[in-house]
């Protein structure tokens, strides 16, 4: 499938987009996270009910928002869902062929968000501990040598 060959996120394009958005980047990223969770929930629910029509809008939304963050693999998955669902609506078919693609959507979204979060705040990816933080010491039992 095409989406499996796509990069998760094109970091070069993302750096360009991030520079253009400036201070608004983090706010827009938080909207993407919220909207993405809603879209995936709607897609999964539409798939459970085998409703091709209900797949189109959230897949279209997720496709566009993913593309804005250069998340090509997620955008390709969403595009596959959207286009197949549109065809199913036109042909009066159920979207059963999309089951594997829909199942792959949530893990891809989670992986994408983790990468975008690391990119947005590289300090958060550091190990806990260090200056200003307590480092958990090994628990020693009272009166016993370590």
Annotate the PLM regions.
Residues 1-9, 25-33, 39, 65-80, ...:
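Amphipathic, coiled-coil-like alpha-helical segments
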Residues 54-55, 74:
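Solenoid-repeat scaffolds in large eukaryotic assemblies
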């Amino acid at each position: 499938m095409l989406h499996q060959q796509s990069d998760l996120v094109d970091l070069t394009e993302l750096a360009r987009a991030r520079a253009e958005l400036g201070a608004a980047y983090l706010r827009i990223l938080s909207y993407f996270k919220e909207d993405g969770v809603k879209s995936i929930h709607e897609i999964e629910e539409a798939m459970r009910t085998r409703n091709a029509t209900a797949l189109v809008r959230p897949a279209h939304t997720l496709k566009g928002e993913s593309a804005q963050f250069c998340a090509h693999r997620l955008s390709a998955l969403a595009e596959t869902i959207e286009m197949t669902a549109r065809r199913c609506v036109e042909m009066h078919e159920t979207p059963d062929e999309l089951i594997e693609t829909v199942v792959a959507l949530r893990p891809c979204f989670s992986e994408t968000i983790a990468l975008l979060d690391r990119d947005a705040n590289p300090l958060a990816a550091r190990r806990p501990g260090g200056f200003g933080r307590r480092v958990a010491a090994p628990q020693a039992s009272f009166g016993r040598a370590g």
